Amino acid sequence: MKLYYIDQRKLFSFMQPVEVWDEQGNVRYRLKSECTVGYHLHLLTPYDEEVASIRQNLLTMVPKFIVKVNGKELAVSLKHPLNDSEYCTVTDLNWKTEGFLKYRTYQITAEDQQIAKVQMVEFSKGEKDALYEALKKIAHVPESALSQGNCCEIDFSDDLNEAEILAVVMAIEAVLCIDSSSSSA
């Protein structure tokens, strides 16, 4: 199964919801921001039922988010090893990202098992126009967002944990947004 969302580097810097849709163009989830100190995000179904919350932990040296999903509390944090590329870890599940986070091309793995793969999806001009027309109706995506070729695809290895995996991916996006704004400051 695959889900899609628009990666807007400052994804959570505004109060407009981010919509996640499936391969048929149906909105499956909506991510809404709450106006608080630090980020507080809610992952909702199209019927506004909360399936997860993602809250920034402000008292840390590195970007860290707490994900509450399926009765569990998971910590998603960014690691910056000195001689290697950065990666994220998810406590309690022993998940780790492998790949290129800042280019949105990575896998989430547990030991040697792939949980999900996230990658940028490039569209041709005709595909972008058709996609924009479809998304304009369902996802309220500005055309400028698509012109950058910044649609991300999440390919799930396990459909049973869809909300959990999606909440972790959105927490990773939030970690990357915090990290890029702090490193550019």
Tell what function each PLM region has.
Residues 51-61, 68:
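A low-complexity, Ser/Thr/Gly/Pro-enriched, surface-exposed linker/loop concept
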Residues 1-40, 46-49, 62, 73-75, ...:
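Low-complexity or membrane-interfacial segments used for flexible interactions
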